[in-house]
Amino acid sequence: MPWFKNLIKISKTITNQSSSYKSITPLASPLLAQFLQFTKQYSTNDHVVGLEATKSDQKPRIVVLGSGWAGCRLMKDIDTNIYDVVCVSPRNHMVFTPLLASTCVGTLEFRSVAEPIGRIQPAVSTQPASYFFLANCNAIDFDNHMIQCQTVTEGVETLEPWKFNVSYDKLVIASGAHALTFGIKGVNEHATFLREVHHAQEIRRKLLLNLMLSDVPGVSEEEKRRLLHCVVVGGGPTGVEFSGELSDFILKDVHQRYAHVKDYIHVTLIEANEILSSFDDRLRVYATNQLTKSGVRLVRGLVQHVQPDKIILSDGTNVPYGLLVWSTGVGPSPFVNSLDIPKAKGRIGIDEWLRVPSVQDVYSIGDCSGFLESTGRQVLPALAQVAERQGKYLASLLNKVGKEGGGHANCAQNINLGDPFVYKHLGSMATIGRYKALVDLRESKEAKGVSLAGFTSFFVWRSAYLTRVVSWRNKIYVLINWLTTLVFGRDISRI
């Protein structure tokens, strides 16, 4: 984009010059002049470029931090006739996480589970005052309605990251959560998580590389067994689904295409307690039996230390591995921890209308937020359906506020917000491989409801997620991938 090139050029040339708003008004357009405002707050240099506060005759600006389920659903439903939208995120797409495990073994292509932000909300690509910024938010000045960001330039060796500020009328913090490591030494250095597309790409590369290397002359029997030992830590839905996909891949594809090493590859799933603890007891027993039949070894234990080639359990057992996937749940990110606002179990504290009550014009949704104790509500689980429904509700609320003239900063105090957010759990689903899945339609663990397992559940699982895929483009991608995998097998190319 031309304006972005101008931003890069200007940010480099003004470091040692005295600048003001007047010095940039002759540039490309009034809009560019608005964007290239110089502020001295937060900056380690003399100046920081950024978006200035909106004026009363302009549309109010909503700034969304994050591009996950919550933030993307909000951006999809927000009325861009009322608001300008600015999204700040280190990734330019939304990940359809329920199908991410399928991409690790070639059942689906990576593009099938990634939806570009510009397709979810076209305004950020087409409207003159709406933007997507590839950046991280480092700090928030709640008093002055401003965020400090730093660009993500990873992979561009010729460009150093720089800071910029964005003023907001309404701020929505939907920055998600980070994988929990429980402070275990070696996890971040040696394990692979499964939360992003690049995680799935890394898992696939490692898996296929280990398969090919183990087939090369000169590799000892012991080293073959280590290279082809896939260890999954965490018995939640993600860990179980990945184990199921991996066992399918081994039984159907490795046995055909890597016949020389098929007897060496195996999967171990390590969980401290019961797998799928939120599911019905009968479904857990069924999943345990099916995974065992598929060759997945279930181990109950606690990881104490992770080394480059093995993990050490709390009882002293050494478990060699060639691929280690870590899926033990999520917790607050360093960014959320850095915010000086009330928290709820480590998350950003919100009220019944998803507002951050300690500051003006700030909302929080998704995995990074939780109801304050004063609301009398429990902190909701970190689930996609929770985040998506919060995004839908908040978009409706902000559209209502904007229509009633409360879109600008500090203008919504006297507006009736209507009914508070209410969450009703629709159930849980998980695939366990071999065309079998679990469907638990209970509203809670203690409630009664329908529980299904087997091929029928697998059909329900696939149908449900196919309908939930964001765009028709990706729906078609997913359907075609499933059909080609069924007919021709999984893609085992290492690119």
UniProtKB/Swiss-Prot annotation:
What catalytic activity does the UniProt entry give for this protein?
A: a quinone + NADH + H(+) = a quinol + NAD(+); a ubiquinone + NADH + H(+) = a ubiquinol + NAD(+)
Cofactor names from the entry are:
FAD
Kindly state what the record says about how the cofactor is bound: Binds 1 FAD per subunit.
Record flagged with keyword ATP-binding: no
Transit peptide located at which residues? 1-41
Give the enzyme's main class according to its UniProt record, as a single word: oxidoreductase
A Pfam family hit: Pyr_redox_2
| Keyword terms | FAD, Flavoprotein, Membrane, Mitochondrion, Mitochondrion inner membrane, NAD, NADP, Oxidoreductase, Peroxisome, Transit peptide
Q: Which compartment or compartments is the protein found in?
A: Mitochondrion inner membrane; Peroxisome
Membrane topology per the entry is: Peripheral membrane protein
* Superkingdom of the source species: Eukaryota
Is Disulfide bond included in the keywords of this UniProt record?
no
Q: Provide the function of this protein.
A: Alternative NADH-ubiquinone oxidoreductase which catalyzes the oxidation of mitochondrial NADH does not translocate protons across the inner mitochondrial membrane.
Q: Give the family this protein belongs to, as stated in its UniProt record.
A: Belongs to the NADH dehydrogenase family.
What is the protein name stated in its UniProt record? Internal alternative NAD(P)H-ubiquinone oxidoreductase A1, mitochondrial
Species assigned in the record: Solanum tuberosum (Potato)
